[in-house]
A protein has these predicted regions:
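Sequence-level preference for short, compositionally simple segments enriched
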Residues: 2-316
Length: 316
């Protein structure tokens, strides 16, 4: 395995993360060891098999500030999918012990502001903080069709849609509107899901858009926390009619609305979307609408086992 080091003080092979990633040949398995510091960079990482390892989420920080409403260098608005701080693609990705942040600010000012755009076929995030406001984490792929002109403008807007399997463990993910969204299959274990109070009427944690036969987003043993007013945050709304989110054995703060989930305006057929829950605890646990499925113990165990098989990294 190729190992390269990044240090802002000049003691490493490179002084920036982008330079280090660019130096890695696509086909070579590589570890990029990133030292402490705030790296103000917009990163594109497209490698076959790469690990980015920081010195700790509070020590190694990758930060950028593009927002969907802000102007792009081509004269058009940046839009959602060019706003990323980090874009990841390739076959196998692992990110550990660092923060990836989009600090463009709240959506009212900056628009959608993606911290991590994850398009790798298989991706693992361990002990990572993903911080932002609107649209913090995009779990690719995109839906098949955009609803607005230039809505999918970005690195994969015209590419064939390919499934991805993503695994997040011991991470913190923060934002306010649809801050975990997309069509990927993703399992979140032992994570803190933090809704930021940007003084808006309602917030939404997930906005899935996956396939009818896909897994969607599964959360297990996570803490949903916030300083938002009680009952003002929904666990999810379907970005596309067949979106799926399941919340299993999680602790829900008082900010979670009693309904739990909500339709996406009048565009949602709740008969197609799949929202499910099992054994939620805390002030945000409540009786849900009939279209939110309450899983039995065996059903929840089966779903979790399937999610782990699909999304957890394979043993060598």
């Amino acid at each position: 395995m190729l190992t390269v080091t990044v240090a802002q003080d000049g003691s490493g092979d490179f002084a920036s993360i982008a330079e280090a990633v660019l130096a890695v040949p696509y086909e070579e398995e590589a570890l990029v060891q990133v030292g402490p510091g705030i790296y103000r960079e917009k990163l594109v990482c497209e490698k076959r098999c790469i690990t980015l390892r920081g010195a700790g989420a509070d020590k190694t920080k990758l930060v950028w500030g593009d927002g969907g409403k802000l102007p792009h260098k081509d004269g058009r608005p940046t839009h959602t999918f060019r706003s990323y701080t980090a874009f990841f693609s390739g076959e196998t990705l692992c990110v550990e012990d660092m923060t990836i942040e989009n600090d463009a600010g709240p959506g009212a000012k900056a628009g959608q502001a993606v911290a991590a755009y994850v398009d790798s076929t298989r991706a693992v995030f361990r002990r990572v903080k993903l911080l932002g406001s609107q649209d913090t984490l995009f779990c690719a792929p995109l839906p098949e069709k955009e609803r607005e002109k230039d809505g999918f403008l970005g690195p994969r807007g015209l590419a064939p849609r390919k499934p991805t399997a993503q695994y997040y463990t011991d991470c913190e993910i923060a934002g306010d509107i649809d801050f975990i969204f997309g069509g990927g299959d993703a399992l979140f274990e032992n994570c803190v899901i933090r809704t930021v109070d940007n003084h808006i009427s309602h917030s939404y944690v997930t906005a899935p858009s996956g396939r009818a036969d896909g897994l969607g987003f599964v959360f297990w043993n996570c803490d949903f926390v916030s300083d938002c007013p009680p009952g003002s945050v929904y666990l999810g709304r379907p970005w596309r009619p067949e979106g799926k989110t399941a919340v299993l054995d999680c602790r829900l703060g008082a900010h979670i609305a009693p309904e739990g989930f909500i339709a996406w305006n009048d565009r949602t057929d709740t008969g197609l979307a799949s929202f499910a829950e099992a054994d939620s605890t805390g002030p945000g646990a409540a009786e849900r609408p009939a279209w939110v499925k309450q899983l039995s113990g065996p059903e929840a165990a089966e779903l979790l086992a399937h999610a782990r098989t699909l999304c957890r990294p394979k043993a060598n």
